[in-house]
Each structure stands twice: as structure tokens, then as C-alpha cells.
Amino acid sequence: MTKPADIRVKSADELGALLIDLRKEQFNLRFQQATGQLEKTGRAVQVRRDIARVKTILAERQRAAAPKA
């Protein structure tokens, strides 16, 4: 599980790479679940939430960088 504080210190490039890695892991976990090979079912939930955390922090940074109307 990745903590939000750990995610916030990373650069945008690092967050992008982390997001790609998490999505690949999520794909593999879904494939394992479909074939009945998934042992740690809770990991799928953790990965989904980590993806949401990364996307939330990226969105916060985009809103902060956007010019005020």
C-alpha cells in the first residue's frame, strides 16, 4: 500500500511510471482472478486504491498549475 505522503514527494514523471506499473499489475491480477490462480484477493483492492491515489494527486497538481479564471 502506497501512502499519499510517499506519492506526493514524487515527480510527475515518477508518478506516471508508477501509474503504468500499477495498471500492469492490475491487469495481471485480473487475469489471475479470471483463471482462478489469484491467491491474495486483497491485493487487487490495494492496487485499485493505489491507482486512485496516484490519479488524485496528479489531478490536484494539474488544478494547482492551471491559471485561475
Swiss-Prot record:
Protein origin, superkingdom: Bacteria
UniProt cross-references to InterPro entries, sorted A to Z: Ribosomal_protein_uL29, Ribosomal_uL29, Ribosomal_uL29_sf
Gene3D superfamilies recorded: 1.10.287.310
GO annotation (BP), single: translation
UniProt keywords, alphabetically: Ribonucleoprotein, Ribosomal protein
Gene Ontology molecular function: any one: structural constituent of ribosome
GO cellular component: a single term: cytosolic large ribosomal subunit
Family in the record: Belongs to the universal ribosomal protein uL29 family.
HAMAP family, per database record: Ribosomal_uL29
Protein name as catalogued: Large ribosomal subunit protein uL29
Organism whose genome encodes this protein: Granulibacter bethesdensis (strain ATCC BAA-1260 / CGDNIH1)
Gene designation per UniProt: rpmC
